[in-house]
Amino acid sequence: MTRRANPAQAALFDEPAVDAADVSFIPLAQQFDALPADWKAVLTPCIAQTNWPELCAFVDGERAAGKPIFPTDVFRALHLTSVDDVRVVILGQDPYHGTGTVDGREIPQAHGLAFSVPAGVRVPPSLRNIYKEIEAEFGCKLPGTSGNLEGWAQQGVLLLNTVLTVEQGQAASHAKRGWERITDCLLEQLARVGHKRVFMLWGSHAQAKRALLSDGHLVLEAPHPSPLSAHRGFLGCGHFKTANDWLAAQRQPTIDWLKPQAA
């Protein structure tokens, strides 16, 4: 099922993309209030048991101090894929902290989906290796050259980072500020509700989350697709076909991995 942005989200993010230095930032609490009801139900217990007010104060304060904080739409992954529709979870670490140039404008690479970048932004090295693995598994080339993965999100792939914000040019700058506890709780909740799912854990950071997942799910582990580690076992891992074979056996719709972009 393709889920469109709800009216609350649309009201927050209806402005055209702007230069990276001028990116607006909607307060975190306001973005949480705009979440779809299903995700809000999942996240409310997580918010209640973590330092959410302090995290909001930190992120909003950094932005108020004039620091470019990426992405603008922090919870975009949750707006594109409903709880019931999540069939595959691909876990990232923190958002891209760099920028790209589109039509002469500098814009953030991060747009709320792990490993994904806005259309027109150069495909990052890790995503190039993900594409390379998919092409090898399915024996054909991916159409186009975009790194925007919203098509996967609309098919039921939750592209989730464990940290949801970052300062421009400062990798892991928002790590250990409270996001990890919230996304850990989200993963635990997601693993407990509804149907069984596929979890793709690439690299030691993602694999450390294995203990959060209840039994019965398909958990696929491999080295990170970064150029530093992809040749140590990510390339050749077979995860995408394995995921589809398992989903088919569960009588769930499979993912068309050859269509990462939205229709």
From Swiss-Prot:
Alphabetized SMART domains for the sequence: UDG (SM00986), UreE_C (SM00987)
Question: Keywords in UniProt for this one?
Answer: Cytoplasm, DNA damage, DNA repair, Hydrolase
What is a biological process (GO) this protein takes part in? Answer: base-excision repair, AP site formation via deaminated base removal
Entry-linked InterPro entries: UDG_fam1 (IPR002043), Ura-DNA_Glyclase_AS (IPR018085), Uracil-DNA_glycosylase-like (IPR005122), Uracil-DNA_glycosylase-like_sf (IPR036895)
Tell me a GO cellular component: cytoplasm
List GO molecular-function terms, semicolon-separated.
uracil DNA N-glycosylase activity
Question: Which residues are named in the active-site annotation?
Answer: D94 (proton acceptor)
Known EC number: 3.2.2.27
Catalytic activity, as annotated: Hydrolyzes single-stranded DNA or mismatched double-stranded DNA and polynucleotides, releasing free uracil
Entry-linked Gene3D superfamilies: Uracil-DNA glycosylase-like domain
Q: Where in the cell is it found?
A: Cytoplasm
Name the major location. cytoplasm
Query: What HAMAP family does the entry give?
Result: UDG
The job of this chain, per UniProt, is described as: Excises uracil residues from the DNA which can arise as a result of misincorporation of dUMP residues by DNA polymerase or due to deamination of cytosine.
- Tell me which family the UniProt entry assigns to this protein: Belongs to the uracil-DNA glycosylase (UDG) superfamily. UNG family.
Q: What name does this protein carry? A: Uracil-DNA glycosylase
- Organism of this sequence: Ralstonia pickettii (strain 12J)
